[in-house]
Amino acid sequence: MKKVALSVVAALAVAASAAPGFAADMPMKAPAAAPPPPPPYALDIAVGGIVQTDYLFRGISQSDKGPSGGAYFEPDLKTPIGTFYAGIAGYSISWPSGPGYGFTDPAAEIDIYGGWRNSWGPFSLDIGIIEYYYPSESWNGVTSSSDFYEIYGKVGYDFGNGFSIGGNIYYTPDLLHYSETFSGLGLPSSKPDAIYYSGTAAYAFPQKFWDISTKISGELGYWDISTSDFLLAGATANPSYTYWNVGISFAYKELTLDLRYYGTDQSAQDCANFLLVGLGNQSNSWCDDEFVAALKFDTSVGIGH
């Protein structure tokens, strides 16, 4: 009996001494590989389009209170110091061209822009320049050019709970190339500069319904326009004005439906002063408060990621 017990103990001892060697011979599972770091440079191309019941630029109709369509193309180069971008966008417009209005009746609005943007945690910054080009303008008696550019800066802060705020500033040294209009009217040649600044706020609801995300947003701004030449040209009031909008948007994949109400503090007379329309055409609705529905499509593709 003792011999049997000793034999069992010896067998267990041999098995125990062999266990580490046996475990060492088992194949070991390799640790999961860490995901590769993002490339230091990456190119994205964003494209999109829009159809809307009216095209408003800071509260003023650009499509004669009628529907408008547009599209854009924007390559973005992501680098270690931020994203550099350039783009082109086009919109169908309809400036009233009857006698005395003073408009040059361009075929479209083409926006050519470029800049740099970056973010640091919740804070974002975007600076750039945009050219507003109006092709095929007609001579209106004093000018055939309304092209102008703006330099801009935008800041934003995301609180991380769906709520975000922002600030924008745009500057142009020659609004709508009015310097040529003033010169054509025999006024001292000068460039009417203008600064537009605004604040924005948005809230994105955390819940989705049928995979549709919802956001409410608004903007309040002021366009500060130099006045001396406007008054010499026959304007009866300061063309500067306050602008605002508030709305709700519903996004599903690449599609967004935006329902928005726009307004300014301009009367028909104030609007005529800003647009420099003839004295016989000062009753207009281009600056009236208005509800606009817009359907947008936005997508992007990465190259070399």
Regions found by a protein language model. Give the residues of each.
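Cleavable N-terminal export/targeting peptides
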Residues: 1-42, 300-305
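Short glycine/proline- and aromatic-enriched beta-strand/turn motifs that initiate or cap beta-hairpins
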Residues: 24-28, 37-83, 87-96
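Short loop/turn motifs that connect adjacent beta-strands in outer-membrane beta-barrel proteins
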Residues: 34-44, 78-85, 119-124, 159-165, ...
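Residues that define the transmembrane beta-barrel architecture of outer-membrane proteins
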Residues: 43, 65-71, 106-110, 123, ...
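Transmembrane beta-strands of outer-membrane beta-barrel proteins
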Residues: 43-49, 83-88, 112, 125-128, ...
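Transmembrane beta-strands of outer-membrane beta-barrel pores
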Residues: 51-57, 90-94, 118, 129-136, ...
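Outer-membrane beta-barrel translocator domains and adjoining extracellular loop/strand segments
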Residues: 57-64, 96-110, 137-146, 176-188, ...
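Outer-membrane beta-barrel "beta-signal"
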Residues: 283-305
